[in-house]
Amino acid sequence: MNGHLCAQGVLPNIRLVNVPSHYKSDTLYNSNDTSIAGRYMLDEMTIIDETNPAYRLMDSVYANRKKHDPDNIGPMRFKTYDKAAAVLAGDEAVKEYITNEIGYKTNLFVMESISEAVVVPPNGKKETVVASKISGVKQPQFNIFLSELSNVSIYQEDIKYIGDTYLSPVNHYVRGNNKKYYFNIEDTIINAPADTTFVLSFRPLLKQDFNGFKGVIKVNSVDWAVESVIADFVKSGASLYDLKINHKFNKHPSGQWLPSEWLTVIGMANGLIAVDTASLTTPADSLQADSAYLFGYPQINVERYFYDYEYDSTLRKRDVGHIKLDMDENAYYKSDTYWNNNRYVPLTEEDENAYKLVDSISKEAHLDKLANLSSVILNGYIPIWIFNMPIEFMAMLDNYEKLRLGIGLETNSRLSKHISLGGFWGWGFRDAKAKWGIYAKALIDKRTDFRAMLGYSKNICKTSSYESIYSRANLFDPETYRYYLGSNWNTVKTEFVDVSIRPFSDFMFRAGFYVSNKKPTYNYQYVVSNSDNILVTRNEFNFTTLNLGVIFAYKEKFVMTSTGLKSRGTKFPILTVDYQRGMKGVLHGEYVYDKIEASLFGRYNVGEKGRFTFEIKGGYIDSDIPYPNLFVPLAGYSPITYFTPRAFGTMRVGEFVSDLYAYIFLQYDFGNIFNRKGLFRPSPSLVFNYGYGNLINNSLEKHIGIDARTMEKGFYEAGFLVNDLFGVSYLSFGLGVMCRFGYYSFPKVLDNLSLKFTVTM
């Protein structure tokens, strides 16, 4: 294409006949370089064949991906050694300066762990940390963090890492018109006859916007397995860090390609460390003439080594179970002799110095206590000596009290690892009344998450709900606002006992016994017949109930922590069933009834951007009971308000009531379909909600003072949202509108509309 022709050896004169159309025909004489006159000039260009051979290679890798997936090998046992070291990256002069100030080379932080793992296809993998060592602190949550950082495989379909999801080039390169990655063969290495290693570069295709990778992958032609991959994470939006991986695989005598050495590098380029160049004793090569500072930044290097592979046909599903990451109780107490004999690779000089430096600082600055403080705060508590102060009791918002300020205290593990005693007190500003409660909690068995709780409270609760001490979700959860949506509130005095247990991997069972007195805060009267068969009204009600429930979450995985099991979720829908039996004549109970509710909730990623969320709910009450325990839909109408998933955004508070209901909530998020970069990345979303409700065993005439009706004709609403319209730092804001239609729509169009705003991170 650049116009140069070369003929080697002794050749006679050559007559060029079939030359490209943009050159003239001519005779070349066997002499020095000769130029061929051009008719016209063309710019140089590169033409790529539509049948790119690199894609044919990736077809074979894709077809064999399950065979070589590290989570799909076995049944097998193996061990891993993990080491994470925080180092200072950036200008060498900065690192030199830090070394001179301290007096020796050192890393900023180091932690290690040794784990024993089992893999039983198709049930997955379980790791047990048998040894752990962390400079300065002894906190189990760091081992969970280390495992999450080092447990990323290029074979995973959707790679979840530090809160984001990335599309693997092995699973998502996709042929045809929907290709996501471009591949190119860079080199071919002949290992032996019929054994070749292909070196391919890859990157996201231009004009594609998704979280992915770019780098180099080596593919073996015999087994079509990945030999190694070196890649940078490519994030579509703003990022707080830079990520790189370097994974190597070795061929086992069995013929299986197994992980050998994995390296993950996390560069926190936004955490700059500046050094005044005037303080440097030696000039820096990278120093610019007009620069007064040099910069470095923290970087975490996470190494994982796999060894002692052993196939074990005796392994069964129960050997994996539902605990993905377990912790040996003696993991933190291994001797130096143990580490010297079992550490897979020796520590560097910088690693050893980091232990000495950080341990000495920890004794002076009490880093272990600070680490414990951060852990507890992330779990919703502030530790004070032998007490924890639950954050949720400090400030609460709802549409009845408007604002409640208070305090809560409960004993922590420093007093007892299994039993906790606590209480709370709060003051509601709108109703000018105090709420309080006392309780005791017990963690009976961590492995089955067997827990018990009993207590007494004087609080408020929404109509149709029964609630114990805890009633608020994490303030940082976008669905927390569901709790604050409008409802008819009741004052409630409750004595209760709750137990829950997870005896099997996919099931959690719970049971509770409640004795409660409810009094509506609104003007409500319930019509009943007295002993003389005369109709009277009441506005205070006593309930004694037995509550049973089960949650089925297929293949839900957990990690073991010091406080019990923590869920890592499941990709399958979650089924929840709750049953309540009202008992008359038992501890002042006045009503006998059966109440059952069930819900099916699921969330699925569609393609590389879309996400579909659904919930189907239903419930039934077989008897005539007061309004506070009937079913009331979650209504969230206001002319302008926050969008709340799985709630009726155009329904008024207390507008409908039922003892038989069925709800459907659907939402589809398209993602950043416009492939915009930066903070303006509009992401449209469609919402559809349906509700049916009726009073089968009750009559509206018996409920005086409520302006409610049934919705047996079907309630319909739909909405259109645009998320990420504009952003501030790492928060994005959006707008949308919900519209009510169908039989229960209002004559005025504006009454059917509700403007919504959204907030995402």
Question: Where is each model-derived feature located?
Answer:
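Boundary at the C-terminal end of the N-terminal hydrophobic targeting segment
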Residues: L5-G9
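Structured extracytoplasmic
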Residues: V17, Y23, A37-G212, T281-M396, ...
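Short, hydrophobic/aromatic-rich segments at coil-to-beta transitions
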Residues: P75, P193-S201, A225-I230, Q256-E261, ...
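Hydrophobic lipid-interacting interfaces of membrane-associated proteins
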Residues: K83-A85, L205-K207, V234-S236, V265-G271, ...
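Exposed, low-structure sequence patches enriched in small/polar residues
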Residues: T165-P169, Y307, Y311-M761
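Extended lipid/amphipathic-ligand handling interfaces
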Residues: G215-I217, S221, K244-G255
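Strand-loop-strand
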Residues: V229-S236, Y241-K251, P259-G271, L421, ...
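Transmembrane beta-barrel wall of Gram-negative outer-membrane proteins
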Residues: L243, K251-E261, I266, I300-D312, ...
